[in-house]
Amino acid sequence: MKHLTMDELEAALDHLRQSPKDAGLLQLIVRRPHVDEREVLEEAQLDPVKGLIGDSWIFRKSSRTPDGSPHPEMQLNIMNSRVTALVAHDKERWPLAGDQLYIDMDLSKENLPAGSRIAIGSAVIEVSALPHTGCHKFVARFGAEAMKFVNSTVGKQLCLRGINAKVIQGGTVKVGSTVRKIATD
């Protein structure tokens, strides 16, 4: 698979910036039952304690917690589906990005700063302050230029690699569900 060049990636910035700001669409749900395993789901349950039910987050160790337990602010990894489509080319390859939820919505720090809440189906999640930066697997699957692109100054402002979130209110999410930014008082 040919990876995109930086010029090709940057040429898509206008399209990426056109993602909906207040109401988007959940386009893909992926459960990661074990390391490097992916299950594409039509529907999933989100839980404030377990995250996405059946996902391996609950068993993953974190270097960011004192006891190495799963980080509560990283229950969910969410990526803008326009970015995923750009780097993955084919929707069959989207799950390789390693995120659980792929949504067509502006995930930028300006639009969804840490603490922002998002309703998806009957669930509510909260955006974490912890950055989602990717790993060596992202480079292997989508190329070094894609990693540089999502972690560039603009990429970080727009959260092109995605965001981390935690479940505030459990509920059911389905592919095709509206993703709605909840106004803060």
Q: Predicted regions span which residues?
A:
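Metal-cofactor-dependent catalytic cores
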Residues: 1-185
